A protein has these predicted regions:
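A boundary/linker detector
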Residues: 1-18, 22-35, 87-99
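Short, non-ligating residues that shape and space the ligands of small metal-coordination modules
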Residues: 32-36, 68-71
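A broad, low-specificity signal marking well-ordered, structured residues that form hydrophobic/aromatic
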Residues: 34, 59-60
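Residues immediately within or flanking Cys/His clusters that coordinate Zn2+
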Residues: 23, 56-59
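Cys/His-coordinated zinc-binding microdomains
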Residues: 30, 63-66
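Short recognition patches in nucleic-acid-associated and regulatory proteins
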Residues: 33-49
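Divalent metal-coordination and catalytic microenvironments
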Residues: 21, 38, 62
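Polybasic, low-complexity binding patches
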Residues: 46-57, 67-99
Length: 99
């Protein structure tokens, strides 16, 4: 992805951003607590403790909706809940840097 090529050489601390995401409410039902759900997935066996630029693609979803998204897939999830997950991820990232 083009975004990653822009920031490959930049050392970023994503822990604060993940805390920011986890302070939000679920995009679907508004509940808390939430998981930081990666749009650009880490994958099975990926090192979730290692900081990654992929952390900036996270959205807040409660455990129920996080599990649902992975069960039915992003396309069906977006259609069912009338969401654009990448757009939401962008708005959250923009809001984080605006604070």
């Amino acid at each position: 992805m083009y975004f990653y090529s822009l920031v490959d050489d930049v050392s970023v601390n994503t822990k604060d951003y993940l805390k920011y995401i986890k302070s939000k409410h679920c995009l679907v039902c508004g509940s808390t607590p939430v998981d930081a759900d990666h749009q650009d997935t880490i994958g099975m066996g990926g090192d979730r403790k290692k900081q990654s630029i992929k952390d900036f693609t996270c959205i807040p979803l409660c455990r129920k909706h996080h599990t649902e998204r992975h069960s039915i897939g992003s396309f069906q999830f977006e259609h069912k809940h009338s969401l654009n997950l990448w757009k939401e991820a962008f708005y959250l990232l923009r809001g984080y840097f605006a604070e």
